[in-house]
Amino acid sequence: MDQGFRQWLTTVFRDRVKWDEPMSRHTTLGVGGPADALVAPETVSELRELIGRCRAQNIAFMVLAGGSNLLVRDRGIRGIVIDMKKYWQTIERHSDRGSGARLTVGAGLTLAALCRYAADNGLAGMTFAVGIPGTVGGAVAMNAGTAEGWMGDVVEAVEMVTGDGRRIRKEKQDLVFSYRRFAVRNDDTATPGPPVITGVDLGLGFDDSEALKAAAEERRRRRTATQPAGFRSAGCFFKNPEAGDPAGKLIDRAGLKGLAVGGAVVSEAHGNFLVNRGNATAGDLLALMETVQRRVADRFGVTLEPEVTIVGQ
């Protein structure tokens, strides 16, 4: 990153660019070395120009959403990290249809805020997401969900800026959702950099607000009872295998709950949570991940794939 590009970032983004920013401050795991620059665009125009200049100068960039499904290595990230949480938190309700309502939601809005809005306004369809950390944009990008529902169930359209700076909109018929994956049918977003989700249209039904709040509270209670509290984590660390027992059960059957490497430990509450006891490094978590993968593979012949995105050096 040359001095001219640094000067442009400082001139345009001022206090919205942070140099050598520790990523441990921006991930739910609380680990990770510094990013060369963390930049928070406020508008689509700023985002497009930032992406265009990165591409023109061959500077790598990645998107930071809620940081809840992200493990950054200890030496950090070279290039630009685009913060899509700070200024992208709007909710716009359109004219209701007979069967429900349509919302346009900023990619940086937290799932928690969206779930509260839906319940408060008698809009059904988001209860499955209660307790899932992160932002709407990040949740769509990985098709976050549970056995009770997925983001793909409620998404009607996605607005994006492509890796070459184009602003595009894709309707439901153009979108493909699968387990922990989102893609575009007949993809024209394929460019040297990833598309950046800026907004999402959601289709929600109608229900009694008090009933929705009660269902949300029950969902919250169940998650609290079965998942670790008091430690930093990324949520479920491994994808569930396509067949057979889920990852957490395999880890439990292998006797790995409580296994620790440095400050990282397999949660006693849920085997698919690798948690930071307060002093973990990314290296600790990666070493623990590899140990769990090896022990599960040796015992059951199953290779666990990480659900978290692992980035950096």
Curated annotation (Swiss-Prot):
It catalyses: UDP-N-acetyl-alpha-D-muramate + NADP(+) = UDP-N-acetyl-3-O-(1-carboxyvinyl)-alpha-D-glucosamine + NADPH + H(+). Cell wall formation. The lineage of its organism: Bacteria, Pseudomonadati, Thermodesulfobacteriota, Desulfobacteria, Desulfobacterales. The active site is at 180, 236 (proton donor), 307. GO terms for molecular function: FAD binding; UDP-N-acetylmuramate dehydrogenase activity. Residues 31-207 form the FAD-binding PCMH-type domain. Gene3D superfamilies: 3.30.465.10, UDP-N-acetylenolpyruvoylglucosamine reductase, C-terminal domain, Uridine Diphospho-n-acetylenolpyruvylglucosamine Reductase, domain 2. Its cofactor is FAD. SUPFAM superfamilies: FAD-binding/transporter-associated domain-like (SSF56176), Uridine diphospho-N-Acetylenolpyruvylglucosamine reductase, MurB, C-terminal domain (SSF56194). This is UDP-N-acetylenolpyruvoylglucosamine reductase. One of its GO terms (biological process) is regulation of cell shape. Its main location: cytoplasm. NCBIfam families: murB (TIGR00179), PRK13905.1 (NF010480). Its EC number is 1.3.1.98. Pathway: Cell wall biogenesis; peptidoglycan biosynthesis. The keyword ATP-binding does not apply. GO terms for cellular component: cytosol. Keywords: Cell cycle, Cell division, Cell shape, Cell wall biogenesis/degradation, Cytoplasm, FAD, Flavoprotein, NADP, Oxidoreductase, Peptidoglycan synthesis. It is found in: Cytoplasm. Belongs to the MurB family. HAMAP family: MurB (MF_00037).
